[in-house]
Amino acid sequence: MGIEEKAPSGFMLAKVSDLVGLIRKSSLWPVTMGLACCAIEMMATGTPRFDISRFGMEVFRASPRQADLMIVSGRVSQKMAPVVRQVYDQMSEPKWVLSMGVCASSGGMFNNYAVVQGVDHILPVDIYLPGCPPRPEMLLNAILELHEQIRSEPLGANRAEAARAVEAAALRATPTHEMTGLLA
């Protein structure tokens, strides 16, 4: 006879980390970070046709202090990179980053000195969303993937250590102009 049988009906037994993961994934608030063409598709995701509010993301926040998800949509110029980083630093923990579109993920067709060749050179990215521009359905799918990632994340100091390790690895990444490979 286990504890489940002794508990009165209507009670649910769960780990605190599972409940916190469920709550976090159901109440993501994205910060407004539309930088280029992909921002149009990101805005379309907020319309009634795609209804992002069913995932707890009704309003895109203008203040980073009220947001916990940054959707970097579009190319990031060298001049905009410090601003993007500052907005990220102003977001409260826990925070997540979704890189939307090929330009945000790798610089896209803009392989030049003026565009950051992937936002992961300035921020730790949790989900990469390919496409030029990605459709709203693809963004919704990426958000659902992020929900699963959030739900299974550890709590407390373990999460902070993991986030610091990911950020350090991202900032140590080799810049694309120094990479050698098939195109070199």
Curated annotation (Swiss-Prot):
Keywords: 4Fe-4S, Cell membrane, Iron, Iron-sulfur, Membrane, Metal-binding, NAD, Quinone, Translocase, Transport. Its cofactor is [4Fe-4S] cluster. Belongs to the complex I 20 kDa subunit family. Its EC number is 7.1.1.-. It holds the Pfam family Oxidored_q6. Coiled coil: none annotated. It comes from Beutenbergia cavernae (strain ATCC BAA-8 / DSM 12333 / CCUG 43141 / JCM 11478 / NBRC 16432 / NCIMB 13614 / HKI 0122). InterPro entries: NADH_UbQ_OxRdtase-like_20kDa, NADH_UQ_OxRdtase_20Kd_su. PANTHER family: NADH DEHYDROGENASE (PTHR11995), NADH DEHYDROGENASE [UBIQUINONE] IRON-SULFUR PROTEIN 7, MITOCHONDRIAL (PTHR11995:SF14). It catalyses: a quinone + NADH + 5 H(+)(in) = a quinol + NAD(+) + 4 H(+)(out). This is NADH-quinone oxidoreductase subunit B. GO terms for cellular component: plasma membrane; respiratory chain complex I. It is a peripheral membrane protein.
